Swiss-Prot record:
The DNA-binding activity of Rv2324 is modulated by interaction of Rv2324 with amino acids. Aspartate is the only effector amino acid that completely abolishes DNA binding. The majority of amino acids induce a dimer-tetramer or dimer-hexamer oligomeric transition. In response to amino-acid binding, adopts an open quaternary association, which is a part of the functional requirement to bind to non-symmetrically distributed target DNA binding sites. Residues 4-65 form the HTH asnC-type domain. Residues 23-42 bind DNA. Transcriptional regulator involved in growth, DNA replication and damage control. Plays a crucial role in regulating survival and growth of M.tuberculosis. Could function as a global regulator in both the latent/persistent and active phases of growth. Binds to its own promoter region and to promoters of multiple metabolic genes, such as serB2, lat, ald and roc operon. In vitro, interacts with intrinsically curved and non-curved DNA molecules, and with both supercoiled and linear DNA, with higher affinity for supercoiled DNA. Binds to DNA recombination, replication and repair intermediates. It comes from Mycobacterium tuberculosis (strain ATCC 25618 / H37Rv). The keyword Transferase does not apply. Contains an N-terminal DNA-binding domain, followed by a linker and a C-terminal effector-binding domain, which is also involved in oligomeric interactions. This is HTH-type transcriptional regulator Rv2324. GO terms for cellular component: cytosol.
Length: 148
């Protein structure tokens, strides 16, 4: 798909803000008919711009009250695919990325409490060639949003 135009971006912004809005409601906001909005949304779905629709649930309501960012330092060099394979089946790891700097990767980890976090960290450290890790526990989230 070519670069999104301003109208596509406005449609995406409306969907991000009001996911349950009808095509007619979105069309009213972006000055298009409901069928025109539907065509654009369908095109963005087919091209992979929109990856799907989901429900966002407050993690605290599900008991995931402890959050940490974990820097991972590995022995020697390790391929990103190996790191992904080591952590993809650990449900507490909600995101993982390779990074620049002294660490090899950073993980975003959720847990029910500190004991659960400690158990998750043990599984994380034992599942790859990890030399050491440094964890930073989140006290409060100040900003949590999607990009504009």
């Amino acid at each position: 798909m070519d670069r999104l135009d301003d109208t596509d971006e406005r449609i995406l912004a409306e969907l991000a803000e009001h996911a349950r809005a009808t095509f007619a409601e979105i069309g009213h906001k972006v000055s298009l008919s409901a069928p025109a909005v539907k065509r654009r949304v369908d095109r963005m779905l087919e091209s992979g711009v929109i990856k799907g629709f989901t429900t966002v649930v407050d993690r605290n309501a599900l008991g995931w009250n402890t959050e940490a960012y974990v820097q991972i330092f590995c022995h020697g060099r390790i391929a990103p695919d190996q790191l992904r394979a080591a952590w993809v089946n650990i449900p507490e790891v909600v995101s993982a990325a390779t990074v620049t700097g002294t660490s090899d990767a950073i993980l975003h980890v959720l847990a029910h409490d500190m004991r659960h976090l400690e158990a998750a960290l043990e599984r994380i450290r034992s599942s790859a060639d990890v030399e050491r890790s440094e964890s930073t526990v989140v006290l409060s989230n100040l900003i949590d949003r999607m990009p504009p």
